[in-house]
Structures are given as structure tokens and as C-alpha cells.
């Protein structure tokens, strides 16, 4: 969540990795719902003058999450046709570099959609079941401007090539993935 003052200066209000889904601002505070990397949707409050002051108001998922393995997304960046592409990996519990693991590639719909570090229940389930779960924002995804998103005339081409390059990159980074 960013704030823009009257001079055009932009500053972070909340700088934590994840996704802020809804918010309201009043009386120098923001109230918002967010998914962080390892915490499902909850309600938070933060003072606008202190980006590090976010306080969790609800604990709706604490009982559900208690005692469960929650993987922290590991960020990766690779190059594809002149673009820096962001992707993430969730590793299984007690990941052992000497063992082999099955893997699952998750591809978002759209193509005009986007992944982030935000908590993802389906990828957490896969990691908890012993899979290396990996996903990226290929060309055609949102959040990087029109030129990145525009794959008109190459739908199923550029995005496919990008996802396959990401898969090759992850297989290089994680030789523990069983082929």
C-alpha cells in the first residue's frame, strides 16, 4: 500500500510482502485486509506515518493454521526475451537437498492475472504433501505495464515459451526435483 502526497511524492504505508486486498483510510490510519506470504487473509490496522506499525486485528485462521507446515515462498528472477520474470518456489517440509521430490507447476489463468508472494492455499497444500510447488508471472501477466501484458497475436506462444523457460530455470536451480 502506497501513499501519494500533494507534491507527488510516493511512500510506502505497508511494505510487507504479500497482497493487500481491500483498504480504507481515515484519521491518519489505514484499515485493510491482507494475505502475507505465510498468513491467510486477516484484518490489519496501520498508522500512515509509520509503515512498520501494521497491527493484526483478527485471528480468524489461527486455529486452522496451528500445527500445520506453512512454506515461505522463495523468490526467483530470470530473463526471458528482454524481460525480468518473477517466480516463486514453495519447498516441502524438512526439504533435504540429498533427496528427490515431485514438483507441480502452477499456471495462472488469464493471461491477464498475477501471482505474488501472497499466501496461496493450493500451493501450500502441495508443499505440505511433499511437492516442490513453483509458479511465475509470464509475459502476458498484469502488473508490469501494457507492453509486458500485451501478447495479442501470440497468446499461447510467448506465455508458453516463458513458462517453459521458467520450468527449465527451476529444474536447474533445484536438481532435487524428480524428472
Language model: regions and residue ranges:
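A short beta-strand motif characteristic of beta-propeller blades
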Residues: 9-14
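Terminal RNA-binding accessory module
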Residues: 1
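Anion-binding and metal-coordination hotspots
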Residues: 17
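Serine-hydrolase catalytic core recognition
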Residues: 21-179
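Structural recognition of the beta-propeller blade-terminating site
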Residues: 4-5, 47
Amino acid at each position: 500500500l502506497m501513499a501519494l502526497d500533494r507534491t507527488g511524492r510516493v511512500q510506502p504505508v505497508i511494505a510487507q510482502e504479500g497482497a493487500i486486498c481491500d483498504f480504507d483510510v481515515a484519521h491518519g490510519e489505514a484499515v485493510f485486509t491482507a494475505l502475507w506470504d505465510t498468513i491467510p487473509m486477516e484484518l490489519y490496522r496501520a498508522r500512515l506515518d509509520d509503515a512498520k506499525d501494521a497491527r493484526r486485528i483478527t485471528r480468524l485462521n489461527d486455529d486452522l493454521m496451528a500445527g500445520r507446515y506453512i512454506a515461505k515462498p522463495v523468490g526467483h528472477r530470470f530473463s526471458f526475451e528482454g524481460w525480468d520474470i518473477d517466480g516463486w518456489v514453495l519447498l516441502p517440509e524438512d526439504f533435504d537437498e540429498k533427496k528427490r521430490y515431485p514438483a507441480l507447476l502452477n499456471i495462472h489463468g488469464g493471461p491477464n492475472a498475477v501471482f505474488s508472494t501472497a499466501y496461496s492455499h493450493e500451493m501450500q497444500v502441495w508443499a505440505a504433501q511433499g511437492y516442490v510447488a513453483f509458479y511465475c508471472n509470464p509475459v502476458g501477466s498484469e502488473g508490469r505495464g501494457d507492453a509486458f501484458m500485451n501478447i495479442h497475436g501470440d497468446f499461447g506462444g510467448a506465455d508458453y515459451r516463458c513458462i517453459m523457460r521458467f520450468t527449465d530455470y527451476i529444474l536447474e536451480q533445484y536438481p532435487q526435483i524428480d524428472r
